[in-house]
């Protein structure tokens, strides 16, 4: 395990809490040991972990299962991954983890300690979407995990393409209120092949029976704004102005996305 001074130095440089860097570091070891499960990483964590080293930090790990896997097998593989991560990294991962199955998939809570003392533990929330509950439209990538820390970690994982990640982020605008989705689309739009994003969006919306309702989205502006700072301030040093991000995201959808 890397020394606590390295974690604290990284936190100062990134302008985020120590707990954010600890979680980022621990997530990498879990990713390495979860690669035995046939699933693909997606969402904001996928952006930081394999595409852009200095992208915003992410709290959770989100995956889509690529085959039917029973709950008991997932529990077994997660226990193996937690124990393997603990042995290889020296991080104090708890052998006990939370596990819940729902209609969409599985929710797992993994706990660990690095600099904390006493009973306090940091949680990593992991969501697995069941096979068939999401439609992957573009070829998956096999990418190396970016590990900007002083110990030795080498791992390759399956991950969504950036275009598919952005398409799901846009769809998410119309499903729930998550400021990180606004930030990601705002930041990534000029860095992906938007032609491909626009080609797959209709199928993405149709699969989840989501409507492209701009009027409803603009009505929820205040909800996004109220959650903006608390949702993102611990994930990056400089948070852009909410009005700039929201206005630009809505304008891009209005002007460039039609179906």
Residue ranges and their predicted role:
Residues 1-40, 49-61, 66-259:
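Structured mid-to-C-terminal alpha-helical surface segments
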Residues 44:
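Active-site glycine-centered loops adjacent to acidic/histidine catalytic or metal-binding residues
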């Amino acid at each position: 395990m890397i020394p606590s001074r390295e974690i604290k130095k990284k936190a100062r440089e990134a302008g985020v809490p120590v707990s954010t860097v600890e979680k980022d570091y621990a997530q990498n070891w879990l990713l390495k040991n979860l690669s035995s499960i046939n699933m693909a990483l997606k969402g904001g964590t996928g952006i930081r972990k394999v595409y852009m080293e200095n992208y915003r930090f992410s709290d959770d790990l989100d995956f889509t299962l690529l085959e039917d896997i029973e709950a008991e097998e997932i529990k077994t593989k997660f226990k193996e991954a937690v124990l393997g991560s603990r042995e290889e990294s020296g991080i104090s991962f708890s052998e006990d983890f939370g596990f819940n199955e729902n209609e969409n998939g599985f929710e797992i809570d993994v706990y660990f300690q690095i600099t904390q003392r006493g009973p306090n533990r940091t949680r990593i929330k992991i969501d697995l979407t069941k096979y068939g509950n999401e439609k992957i439209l573009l070829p998956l990538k096999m990418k190396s995990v970016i590990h900007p820390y002083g110990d030795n970690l080498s791992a390759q994982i399956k991950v969504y393409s950036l275009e598919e990640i952005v398409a799901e982020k846009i769809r998410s605008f119309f499903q729930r209120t998550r400021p990180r989705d606004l930030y990601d689309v705002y930041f990534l739009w000029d860095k992906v092949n938007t032609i491909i994003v626009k080609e797959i969006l209709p199928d993405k919306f149709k699969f989840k029976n989501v409507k492209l309702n701009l009027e409803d989205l603009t009505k929820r502006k205040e909800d996004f704004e109220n959650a903006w700072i608390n949702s993102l301030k611990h994930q990056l040093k400089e948070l852009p102005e909410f009005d700039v991000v929201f206005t630009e995201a809505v304008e891009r959808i209005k002007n460039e996305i039609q179906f």
